[in-house]
Amino acid sequence: MMTRFAGMPQRIALTIVLVAFISALWLVVLAETAPITSSVVHKYTDPDTYLDILALMHSGVGYYEAAHEILLAHGYGLRSVFNWRTPAWMELLSLLPSIVWAQKLLAILTSATLLLAYRMIRAQGNIALAIPAIIGIFFSIVLLARDRGIVMSEVATGALILLSVVNYGNGQWLVGLLAALAALFIRELAAPYILICVAFAAYRANARELVGWALGLSAYFAYFSWHWIEVMQQIAPTDRADPNGWIRFGGIRFVLETAHFNGLFNLTPLWITAALLPAALLGLFAWRDGLRAAVTVTTYLCIFAVVGKPFNDYWGALYTPLLMLGLPWSIPAAYDALAPRRPSALPQLCDTPAQDNL
């Protein structure tokens, strides 16, 4: 059950743990004192938008026509293609009798992911780490998907990114690749994770996986090009552009609000999220199977410090399920950093590499 810190020089391991602890204290203070970036309460929210679009689709209206009507009626900017979601998730929802069916399907997908996550954690940990992780994962996704949350494509995308990560961790790169591509087709915000996966495949010189990525991304390019054409056909000369854009530099406060968009964290004050975020990152980086997840979470945190409107905190659903993998590992990570070193263990930096230990 040893983490990376067990074979690391103790001075370095202790420094990392200390930085995580100080970061947690700083984030707690920030959470309690900084102005809330999403303080403006909108009577009509993005979930309302997509519920109304879905209602029109159930009445027989096509996705793009329905999206144009609802977005225009509620003052959304229409001239940028990125204000229009790609249609995959809404088309899938429109095929189901109600959103309850979608919630059940997502629960089934999450349950399958839990089994794979359990196997992944048990490969290097024990049941005391695996059980809290899978419980946290289940509620972090399912509680977000209740009520109106299921229409938000970020929830399904985050579940698929998690499925991809655990399959890579179990050595099933093909399933991991397909799950990642499914996430991308549902929401283009999965693109940072896709680039991370391609980088991992290149580092490992996995030629077959790189071919798979070339084919998959070519298909996505065709799909998004078709989406672009459909959007351009809907835009009228009188349609307005969004005057603000997404580059807002919301900083650490907005990052915390995205991290708070988690089925479990949402039940607690923001300062709890602030305290647990560094612990989860510490656990992911210390866990020998956690590097892909750690890099993914860190990448999204950096992006959201710059990109995102104040009400886009729900983008956190893309990465917050991964935090549940890291939280249990923060405890053995701290123990390995603080425990006295055995002389025979000092020269050894790493044990035998795990499936996804890069």
Regions found by a protein language model. Give the residues of each.
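Membrane-interface alpha helices of multi-pass inner-membrane proteins
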Residues: 161-167, 173-201, 218
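Transmembrane-helix motifs of polytopic, lipid-linked glycan transferases
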Residues: 91-95, 100-126
